[in-house]
């Protein structure tokens, strides 16, 4: 539930 490199709400790249 954290923002990743793409800003996705699951914190994926």
Curated annotation (Swiss-Prot):
Single GO biological process annotation from the record: proteolysis
Subcellular location: Secreted
UniProt keyword list: Hydrolase, Protease, Secreted, Serine protease
Entry superkingdom: Eukaryota
Temperature dependence: Optimum temperature is 37-50 degrees Celsius. 49% of maximum activity is seen at 60 degrees Celsius, no activity is seen at 70 degrees Celsius. Thermolabile, a significant decrease in activity is seen after incubation at temperatures above 42 degrees Celsius for 20 minutes.
EC number: 3.4.21.-
Changes after translation: Not glycosylated.
pH effect on activity, per entry: Optimum pH is 9.0. 20% of maximum activity is seen at pH 5.0. Inactive below pH 5.0 and above pH 11.0, inactivation by acidic pH is reversible.
Regulation (activators, inhibitors): Strongly inhibited by pMSF, chymotrypsin and SDS. Inhibited by the trypsin inhibitors Tos-Phe-CH2Cl, Tos-Lys-CH2Cl and SBTI, and by bivalent cations. Slightly inhibited by the elastitinal and metal chelators EDTA and EGTA, by ethanol and by non-ionic detergents.
UniProt GO MF annotations: serine-type peptidase activity
GO CC entries: extracellular region
Subunit structure: Monomer.
Function: Serine protease. Degrades fibrinogen.
Family according to the record: Belongs to the peptidase S8 family.
Name of the protein described by the UniProt record: Serine proteinase
UniProt source species: Scedosporium boydii
